[in-house]
Amino acid sequence: DYLYNEDRSSDYRHLNHILAAYLGYTLKYKDFTFKPGVRYEQTVQRVKYIVGPGENFHTNFSDLVPSVSLGMKLGKTQNMRVGYNMRIWRPGIWNLNPYFNNLNPMFITQGNSNLKSEKSHAFDLSYSNFSAKFNINVSLRHSFNNNSIENISRLITAPEGEMFDNDPTHIAPEGALYSTYANIGKSRNTGMSLYLNWNASPKTRLYVNGRGNYSDLKSEAQGLHNYGWNGSFYGGVQHTLPLKIRLSLNGGGSTPYINLQGKGSGYYYYSLGASRSFLKDERLSLNVYCSNIFEKYRSYNNHTEGVNFLSKS
């Protein structure tokens, strides 16, 4: 049995409306293709609390997103492309929700309903070669962002604690770790990615997908700076046996990712699968799949560091 506590509830209705308009143009001349374009997006979010102490809020985002690319055909199967685009990342409800979550009074979290869309500017240069037996795509990319949304944690050091939102019920005691979000980050990322597919025989296919990236993250307002390398890899082999049974062996992983106040956890995985299709046009498929079968448990480690505190989980 349990007793329902409305004061601890965060039951709300979230409405998210996105309107968009697109404009693009393609110009071709001999082996060159030029594509400028622009997209406008209007986002309206409304949150209304049904049960609980949370406050209703609404927020709007207006974003103009340009892009441009120049492609060049090098041969029948080869292409090169250079381009620029701006990407936006709208904060989700978990970033925006101002609910003061002090279920654990020593680890308090709260969203920020004043967040703005995160805008990232990216320049890329890519080469591709696609043929019947061999496919490859190599891309070099640099991006920067001057208003990235970062999770910020700080230790409450005042002996009397600290009050938030001018609400006497929103008190973080001395020694508590308070976390929220803010558009305070500046990031610079340079990386390379590789996709490779080789049809070694009519029944065997090998594929590799990998990337490496160097990140430099900074918040001058908070006096924070972090940088480092991150890489990920995915690859596998697929082979067709008699009776049209397809076997696949896959594996991959990633090194720890870098954030403004520390780093996340690296990981790896592996899997084995078998499949068989039936009926006309192979409309029915039977699949058997297993992954990480030699491990009962997995651990993931996160490292967060700030003024006067160090958190590991």
PLM features: what roles do these ranges have?
Residues 27-31, 64, 72-76, 88, ...:
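Outer-membrane beta-barrel strand-turn architecture
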Residues 21-27, 68-72, 125-129, 140, ...:
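Residues on the lipid-exposed face of transmembrane beta-strands in outer-membrane beta-barrel proteins
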Residues 16-55, 61-67, 71, 76-121, 142-174, 198-214, 257, ...:
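Surface-exposed extracellular loop regions of Gram-negative outer-membrane beta-barrel proteins
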Residues 3-15, 19, 110-112, 116, ...:
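Outer membrane beta-barrel strand-and-loop segments of large Gram-negative receptors
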Residues 278-313:
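C-terminal beta-signal and adjacent terminal beta-strands/loops
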Residues 1, 34-38, 66, 80-82, ...:
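Transmembrane beta-strands of outer-membrane beta-barrel proteins
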